UniProtKB/Swiss-Prot annotation:
It is found in: Cytoplasm. The keyword GTP-binding does not apply. InterPro entries: P-loop_NTPase, PRK/URK, Uridine_kinase, Uridine_kinase-like. This is Uridine kinase. Pathway: Pyrimidine metabolism; CTP biosynthesis via salvage pathway; CTP from cytidine: step 1/3; Pyrimidine metabolism; UMP biosynthesis via salvage pathway; UMP from uridine: step 1/1. The lineage of its organism: Bacteria, Bacillati, Bacillota, Clostridia, Eubacteriales. One of its GO terms (molecular function) is uridine kinase activity.
Amino acid sequence: MKRPVLIGITGGTGSGKSTVAKEIYNKFDEACIAMIEQDSYYKDQSSIPFEERCKKNYDHPDAFDNELLIDHLKNLVDLNVIEKPIYDFEAHNRKEETIKVEPRDIIILEGILVLQDPKVRELLDIKIYVDTDADVRIIRRLLRDINERGRTVDSVINQYLTVVRPMHMQFIEPSKRYADIIIPEGGHNRVAVDMMVANIKHLLQK
């Protein structure tokens, strides 16, 4: 097995980056592709009371355990199996269980700050930024956090205005300049997704 092709997919909350990642994932046989979500690498907070965990800024680079993420990416590149953490968004903490991820020909890393850390960027073969209007992103974030993460409307809006938007402007939007490809309209941009798939297949044939 050759060195895997590492693809980083980033963009603001609700931009459609997960949709793009899944669209690319579904174009390949499951035996040759793996997905790594940056959300899985939020820091372990077992020593912090729940009330304090609720107040944390989860859109700041310091919220992520990039040391572990980088170690896992390097292990996958070296064709080693990893134990990916599982993050509980309602408890704001990692679960005790992990998910075994085996090395594959293609590794997709998806998350809001994938291109922010230079040590992560240098491991990536393809860097993608998914660009979507802010009003579309906030509506998607609202629906997701209420339906999937047990949040209230007021808490989501307050978090967006005080944390999510400022962090987007400070860290996520500036990381766009590191992207090889910028995809507008998120996962609905079929032409861009098909172009990415063709590019990945080309890299695999080298």
